[in-house]
């Protein structure tokens, strides 16, 4: 394991990427070492640890959630992407908070992970729509549109009257995906 972790943190992206299948093949025995590496001082080492955790079918969502609060935006983004591979409703609250991340990639990937989780994400996403900044509302509405849950219909209908063309677009997309593809507009 030590040799594989050395490859993973070698600073050479090709060597690091090539070490991941062997690390994953170790199964559950690799997870504790990767979680320890995810707390390393070096952001690049943390990123590669998250990358390897994302590839492992033995990684639990609960192990990835704390990494959404990492000090490095690239590690937060990797954690959100990892949660796309390991979606679980236990991550909904943390991912909902990550929609507000200053890093646009992290916020967008958090929205994608919420879509992968599906229906359990809807109450949090509806709450976000109540007063979040416009950029965050766009991410939330895009997620609601992709989840296709009827609980989002009132919010989508309300958004059709908003000034934002992007919000209107995602509301129309969501309504269309729900089979409500009529033209909605003010008379």
What is the meaning of each model-derived region?
Residues 6, 13-28, 36, 44-58, ...:
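Structural detector for internal amphipathic alpha-helices that build alpha-solenoid repeat scaffolds
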